[in-house]
């Protein structure tokens, strides 16, 4: 076993102070690396009170390189200033302390910290490992930041793709895009992010409930999910819905529930505990993921771990479809039309217990590659190569 690697993990957020797939990945990665005897430093922005110690394995050295800052606008988009501040903080830290590290492991987005690490790499002689959860298309950049801003964003992304690095992607979609952006070298595909126990799930009969779980931002298209549930409820007696999560689209969610007259059968309680999410996943007819943009689609794996199928909407920026085998662990709606999504929900309903059995079997067959441990082993192999 490779031991004693000095690793600097770089991410501007830390779970559970902010919640998301990237936050979970870097916390899990850091804690597993520390548990295996590696020397881990975690660079981040401060997200807790002054003088407090963050809730993290004490073997991990947490260094804040920037102050506490709001990361998102009211509409749910990333603010520009925090990534700039974080990038500068990372640059200054690595300028002073970079020689102590053998590997700097960073997320590609929001880019400036990666550029800082890449700029100092020739001087400080560490290896740079980069996780690309997503590679945005030019059209998505324009939608997100407008014409000029989108052009600048796409150019910065292209620059980041071309710096020397050991690149990791979590889907074929984004691996192919990264190569197209001009990456020099190979892309390592990491398929496993699931950190919970990998026991084979025991299927149970579903309740007539569609579950939505995620941050309520425009990309998740939560009002589209409500419309689809309303249409499916016309054909499935007693069908309801549970929408777990919070965010800037919560007001729109409540309005959509009222507009479709679903107040008695659809609930939207906001942020939920892990225990509540687990219970809802186990009983749900399906997990509904109407997102138009996903770098991975973790909720599909989490649902399958409980023998619950998923319904996912196809789209050019949605990598979650890679986790779906239609008719086995869920269904794919070909378009973002509410009727197409409702039809997919109906197909899951018609699949009955047999589809829940096949979903559990799918999870068991893919458990090894879907596990965090499999990705960790791949990452460690890359570290060993860097040390050699």
Language model segments and positions:
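Nucleotide-activated donor-binding/catalytic signature segment of Leloir-type glycosyltransferases, i.e.
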Residues: 254-272
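Aromatic "clamp/platform" in nucleotide-sugar-dependent glycosyltransferases that forms part
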Residues: 292
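Short alpha-helical donor nucleotide-sugar binding micro-motif in glycosyltransferases
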Residues: 271-272, 279-284
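Conserved acidic donor-binding segment of nucleotide-sugar-dependent glycosyltransferases
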Residues: 325-338, 346-353
């Amino acid at each position: 076993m490779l031991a004693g690697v000095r690793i600097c993990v770089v991410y501007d957020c830390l779970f559970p102070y902010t919640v998301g797939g990237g936050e979970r990945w870097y916390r899990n990665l850091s804690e597993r690396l520390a548990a295996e005897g590696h020397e881990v430093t975690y660079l981040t922005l401060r997200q807790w009170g002054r003088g407090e110690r963050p809730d993290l394995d004490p073997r991990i050295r947490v260094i804040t390189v920037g102050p506490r800052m709001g990361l998102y606008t009211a509409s749910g988009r990333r603010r520009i200033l925090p990534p700039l501040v974080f990038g500068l903080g990372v640059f200054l830290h690595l300028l002073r302390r970079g020689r102590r590290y053998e590997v700097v492991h960073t997320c590609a987005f929001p880019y400036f910290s990666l550029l800082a690490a890449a700029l100092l790499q020739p001087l400080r002689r560490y290896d740079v490992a980069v996780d690309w959860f997503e590679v945005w298309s030019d059209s998505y950049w324009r939608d997100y930041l407008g014409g000029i801003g989108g052009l600048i964003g796409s150019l910065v992304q292209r620059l980041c793709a071309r710096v020397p690095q050991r690149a990791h992607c979590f889907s074929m979609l984004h691996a192919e895009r990264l190569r197209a952006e001009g990456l020099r070298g190979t892309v390592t595909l990491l398929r496993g992010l699931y950190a919970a126990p990998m026991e084979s799930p025991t299927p149970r009969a579903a309740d007539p409930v569609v579950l939505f779980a995620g941050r309520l931002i425009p990309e998740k298209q939560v009002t589209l999910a409500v419309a689809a549930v309303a249409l499916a409820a016309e054909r499935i007696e007693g069908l309801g819905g549970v929408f777990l999560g919070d965010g800037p689209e919560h007001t729109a969610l409540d309005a959509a529930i009222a507009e479709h007259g679903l107040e008695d059968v659809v609930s939207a309680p906001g942020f939920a505990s892990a225990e509540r999410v687990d219970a809802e996943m186990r009983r749900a007819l399906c997990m509904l993921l109407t997102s138009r943009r996903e770098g991975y689609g973790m909720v599909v794996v989490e649902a399958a771990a409980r023998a619950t199928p998923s319904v996912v909407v196809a789209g050019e920026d949605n990598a979650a479809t890679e986790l779906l085998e239609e008719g086995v662990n869920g269904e794919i709606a070909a378009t973002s039309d509410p009727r197409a999504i409702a039809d997919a929900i109906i197909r899951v309903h018609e699949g009955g217990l047999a589809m829940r059995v096949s979903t559990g079997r799918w999870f068991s067959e893919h458990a090894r590659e879907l596990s965090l441990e499999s990705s960790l082993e791949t990452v460690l192999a890359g570290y060993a190569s860097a040390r050699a």
